[in-house]
Amino acid sequence: MTIALSVENLTAAVGGREILKGIQLDLPFGEVHALMGPNGSGKSTLCHVLSGRPGYEVVGSAHLAGAPLLGLDVDERARLGLMQGFQYPVEIPGVKLGEFVAEAAAEAGMGEDEIERRVAEAAEKFDMTRFLQRGVNEDLSGGEKKRSEIFQMAVLGPKVALLDEIDSGLDIDAVREVAEAVEVMRSPEVGVLMITHYSRILRYVIPDRVHVMVDGRLVDSGGPELADELEAGGYEAVRARLGLAPGGENGQAKAKVTDLFTDLPFET
């Protein structure tokens, strides 16, 4: 089992306030891992720190296929093979999707023939052919925007894909659509870390591992059955089983995961 992403004793703070507290995580190539946790638990912060967003005081280590990540800027991490899918993909009117992803592939060192082949194959695989001549994410539904991001990743061929709240703000049909795209993306050449509040997307994407983050710490890991436990009893059930104090230092509400099945966009 070859590790795509390795995170060791990672802490991150903003203005002296610690958000991530000693994160340990291994993501092998070929696996999809789900990272779940209450709002404000630090899930998206982990994604931001790994992708190189500035403004965090970071200690610890993170490696992509054995190469150190910390200290590199966003572009350098992308060239190593780390890509992030965003909660709210932006529209770029006037810049055609096909040209946009082809230029990014050229920047990554791909030749013309390879780019043409990869764009055509991925567009067919993710049902994006009809959008190639349209502005990036222009007039697309929420589900189509998220699928567009996965399409772009498939063309560029990352080693690790970070999918941050990819199901946020989507209705159930769009969640199913995005989940199908994630399943199509599964490959022995890529590790996928899917960050979510909800267990509903895990009805369609069966993760190899589920990790639970509470108050900036990874407190539990297991198979898909861990997501079932969360849906049945909420995060407080996990806290109780692990002997953790209820509510957490951030005053988290004692909500069941099923109570979080709304289409409101959350920032974590």
Model-identified regions with their sequence ranges:
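ABC ATPase C-loop
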Residues: 153-154
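Conserved structural motif at the start of ABC-family nucleotide-binding domains
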Residues: 5-7, 20-22
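Conserved beta-strand-loop-alpha-helix hinge in the C-terminal portion
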Residues: 213, 217-240
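Conserved ABC ATPase "signature" region
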Residues: 114-131
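Walker B catalytic motif
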Residues: 165-166
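The feature captures the beta-strand-to-loop junction immediately N-terminal to the Walker
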Residues: 36-38
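ABC ATPase NBD Q-loop/coupling interface
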Residues: 61-77, 137
